[in-house]
Structures are given as structure tokens and as C-alpha cells.
Design a protein with these regions (language model features):
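Conserved Switch II/interswitch segment of TRAFAC-class P-loop GTPases
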Residues: 3-26, 47-51
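Conserved catalytic network of the ASCE P-loop NTPase/AAA+ motor domain
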Residues: 2-6, 32-37
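A generic secondary-structure signal
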Residues: 29-33, 77-78
Length: 183
């Protein structure tokens, strides 16, 4: 019953797995139950364990060239098995590899009313300037839409509408400027 109300479904799959039959069946079940297909975000975890696992670069905390090729193959396969509006992303959470990219993708995938609240709970080391700017922009857009909806409920003379539009822009600018204090 709650599926249609979910802002985003983050589906974690192991990058070092080969069999996704149970995930495919569950994905199809959720779609049949009313989950919005555009709300799925697929993430490959354990990127550091993908073949050849012994080549993971512990110093740089990143995959080797051969592992990058393996991840590209797995990513393409998962994207085919689980169509999504968003790209499939690989991460190695224990070492923090690709987590800022995941956060950025997640923030872009969320509806505008959820971005700031979610972003405020992200650890500093996983934040990116791009994700922060997107959260601030969607916050301003949401305020603008709310303001416009409130003004549209009433009949105002043209001169007052002009003043309200000016006030709207200033209010939005002020709140976006204060965004990091609010969230």
C-alpha cells in the first residue's frame, strides 16, 4: 500500500554476485504491486571484491584497471536486468569508494521536497558540492512553488502581484542563502 508513496527505492546488489533471480522476481513483484519504475536506484556494493579482488588498490582505495572492466560488465548486465531512470552505480562502502558519487546520484533522484532533509543527514566526507547545490536549488524551487500556490488562492490587484513577485524572489534568495543553517 505504501509503494506508490515512496520517494525512492534504493536497491543494493552485490557486484561480486552472479545470480540475481530472487532480485528479479522481487523487482517484478514490486512493479506489479504499484511501485513506480522511475523511483528505483540500483547500486552495486562490494566493488572491492569484484574479480580480480586481489588487485584492489588499497593505497588509493580504488579498483584496478581490470576491476574497472569487470565492474563495467556487471553494471551493464544489471542495467539490462533492472531498467531504471538512473545509472547503476558501484560502491565499496567500507573504504568509502564512490560514496560521494552515490550521494550525488541519490540527491538528484529524490523529489525536490526530500533533497534537503536527506542531504542534511549525509556524512561530511560523502557530500559533494554538486549534491549540495542541487539540494539548495530544489529547496528554492519548492519554496517558490509553495509561495506561488499560496498567492494563486487569492485575487490580488496587479500592483500587489508585482510587489509579491519581488518579495517572493527576495524571500527565496534569503532562504537559499540560509539553507546550510536550516539543514
Amino acid at each position: 500500500q505504501l509503494l506508490p508513496e515512496l520517494d525512492l527505492i534504493i536497491w543494493i546488489l552485490r557486484a561480486d554476485e552472479r545470480a540475481y533471480a530472487a532480485d528479479i522476481a522481487m523487482h517484478q513483484f514490486l512493479l506489479n504491486e504499484g511501485a513506480d519504475p522511475s523511483r528505483f536506484l540500483f547500486v552495486l556494493s562490494h566493488a572491492d571484491r569484484v574479480f580480480p579482488a586481489e588487485e584492489w588498490n588499497d593505497t588509493e582505495k580504488c579498483p584496478s584497471r581490470q576491476q574497472e572492466l569487470s565492474l563495467a560488465t556487471v553494471t551493464a548486465r544489471v542495467a539490462t536486468l533492472f531498467p531504471s531512470s538512473f545509472p547503476v552505480l558501484s560502491v565499496a562502502a567500507p573504504v568509502g569508494w564512490n560514496l560521494p558519487a552515490f550521494v550525488s546520484l541519490m540527491i538528484h533522484a529524490l523529489p525536490p521536497q526530500a533533497t534537503s532533509a536527506v542531504y542534511s543527514h549525509i556524512r561530511g566526507e560523502n557530500r559533494s558540492e554538486q549534491a549540495q547545490k542541487h539540494a539548495q536549488q530544489t529547496f528554492g524551487d519548492a519554496i517558490g512553488k509553495s509561495f506561488d500556490a499560496a498567492v494563486a488562492r487569492f485575487s490580488f490587484p496587479a500592483w500587489m502581484l508585482h510587489l509579491l513577485r519581488k518579495a517572493r524572489d527576495r524571500i527565496i534568495h534569503l532562504l537559499v542563502t540560509l539553507w546550510d543553517r536550516l539543514f
